[in-house]
C-alpha cells in the first residue's frame, strides 16, 4: 500500500558450504569482549549487532505526528480484507490456492530475502535466487529492501530504545502497526541514517528495486494477484480483489508484524533473559520460521534464525533446498557449543537444549 512510503519524509563457484560459528574459547577474551560481540565472527557486517552503549536521551518523547494517509489506507485495506474473509466460501478453489501460494512466496521475500539475506547477510545467494527473492519481496510490499533492511538493522542495534523503529516498550499496537502510522522518532532517523548501508548501495538489484518500487508494487502486490484468478479461471472480480489481494496482503502484513509485537511480549527467553524478544512458536507458524526471536536476537548472524533449523521453520528448509541446487551458499550456523554456553550464561532456564 503506497501509504507505507509516507511514514518518513523521503530525502564464482557453485559449491554450497555451511559456516559454523563458534564461541571464542579463551576465558580472558570473554572477560574483555562485550557480550554482544563475543560470538559474532562476521568481519564484513556489524550493523545488526546490539549496541548496549546507546541510551535514550532524558526528557519526554516528542509528540506523535500522525500520517493520516497511512491510517486511512490501512483501515481501508483491513476492511477490504474482512470482506474478503466473507467471500472465501464463495471463491473458487483455484483462487484460494493462488492466494496461499502468493502468501508463501511473499513471506519468503521477507524471511529468506530482505531479512536473512539482505539485512543480516547470514548466507549468500546466486543471481537467480536474488532475482526471485527481490520479486517475492516486492509482492509482499513492506517497503523496499534498502529501507526495510536499514530499519531492521536499527531495530537490532538499538533494540528497545527510541532509535528502534518499532520499540516494543511503546505497547503492542505501536510495535505491531502503529509505528507505520506516525512519523519516525527523531532518534530513528538520526541513528538509522548513520548505519553503514554500503553493501546494499553497491548491490544493483536492490537499488533497481528501490528506484522502480512504486510501479513494481502496484503490479506485483495488487494488479497481478487480482488479474490472474479473474482472467484465467473466471473468478468474480470482487473475489479476486478482496480475497487474493486484500485478504492475502493483510495476512502477510500481520504475520510479519507479529514478530515485532507478539514475539517481543509473549514467550520464553531461553537464550538471553536480559532482552525482550521471545520464542513464540505461533508466530513462527504464521511467518514460516521467524518467531524464534530470542534466539535470533542472541545470534542474528545464524541463517536459520533458530537453534533447530527445520522445526516450524519453512524458510530454513527453503534456503537449504536452494543450497542443494547451488543457488545459496556460505550459510552461517552457530555451533552447539556456543548456543549451550549462551544458554548457561544468560538464559532464563526454560531451554531443554542439550
Curated annotation (Swiss-Prot):
Disulfide bonds: none annotated. The lineage of its organism: Eukaryota, Metazoa, Chordata, Craniata, Vertebrata. Fe cation 1 binds at residues 115, 120, 152, 156, 296. Residues 1-67, 114-212, 259-354 are cytoplasmic. A motif (Histidine box-2) lies at residues 152-156. The gene is SCD. Fe cation 2 binds at residues 155, 264, 293, 297. This is Stearoyl-CoA desaturase. One of its GO terms (cellular component) is membrane.
Amino acid at each position: 500500500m503506497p501509504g507505507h512510503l509516507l511514514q518518513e519524509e523521503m530525502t564464482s563457484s557453485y559449491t554450497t558450504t555451511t559456516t559454523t560459528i563458534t564461541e571464542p574459547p579463551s576465558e580472558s577474551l570473554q572477560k574483555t569482549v562485550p557480550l554482544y560481540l563475543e560470538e559474532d565472527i562476521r568481519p564484513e557486517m556489524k550493523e545488526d549487532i546490539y549496541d548496549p552503549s546507546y541510551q535514550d536521551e532524558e526528557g519526554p518523547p516528542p509528540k506523535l505526528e500522525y500520517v493520516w494517509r497511512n491510517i486511512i489506507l490501512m483501515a481501508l485495506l483491513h476492511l477490504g480484507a474482512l470482506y474478503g474473509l466473507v467471500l472465501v466460501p464463495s471463491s473458487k478453489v483455484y483462487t484460494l490456492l493462488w492466494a496461499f501460494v502468493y502468501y508463501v512466496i511473499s513471506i519468503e521475500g521477507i524471511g529468506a530475502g530482505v531479512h536473512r539475506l539482505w539485512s543480516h547477510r547470514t548466507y549468500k545467494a546466486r543471481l537467480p535466487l536474488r532475482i526471485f527473492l527481490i520479486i517475492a519481496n516486492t509482492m509482499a510490499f513492506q517497503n523496499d529492501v534498502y529501507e526495510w533492511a536499514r530499519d531492521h538493522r536499527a531495530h537490532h542495534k538499538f533494540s528497545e530504545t527510541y532509535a528502534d523503529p518499532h520499540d516494543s516498550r511503546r505497547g503492542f499496537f505501536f510495535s505491531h502497526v502503529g509505528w507505520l502510522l506516525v512519523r519516525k522518532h527523531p532518534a530513528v532517523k538520526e541513528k538509522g541514517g548513520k548505519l553503514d548501508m554500503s553493501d546494499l548501495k553497491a548491490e544493483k538489484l536492490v537499488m533497481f528495486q528501490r528506484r522502480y518500487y512504486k510501479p513494481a508494487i502496484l503490479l506485483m502486490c495488487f494488479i497481478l494477484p487480482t488479474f490472474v484468478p479473474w482472467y484465467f479461471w473466471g473468478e468474480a472480480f470482487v473475489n479476486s480483489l478482496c480475497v487474493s489481494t486484500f485478504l492475502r496482503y493483510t495476512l502477510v502484513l500481520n504475520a510479519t508484524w507479529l514478530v515485532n509485537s507478539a514475539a517481543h511480549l509473549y514467550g520464553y527467553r531461553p537464550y538471553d533473559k536480559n532482552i525482550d524478544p521471545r520464542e513464540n512458536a505461533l508466530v513462527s507458524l504464521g511467518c514460516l520460521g521467524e518467531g524464534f526471536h530470542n534466539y535470533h536476537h542472541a545470534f542474528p548472524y545464524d541463517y536459520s534464525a533458530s537453534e533447530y533449523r527445520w522445526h516450524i521453520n519453512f524458510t530454513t528448509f527453503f534456503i537449504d533446498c536452494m543450497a542443494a541446487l547451488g543457488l545459496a551458499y556460505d550459510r552461517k550456523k552457530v555451533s552447539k557449543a556456543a548456543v549451550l554456553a549462551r544458554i548457561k550464561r544468560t538464559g532464563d532456564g526454560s531451554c531443554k537444549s542439550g
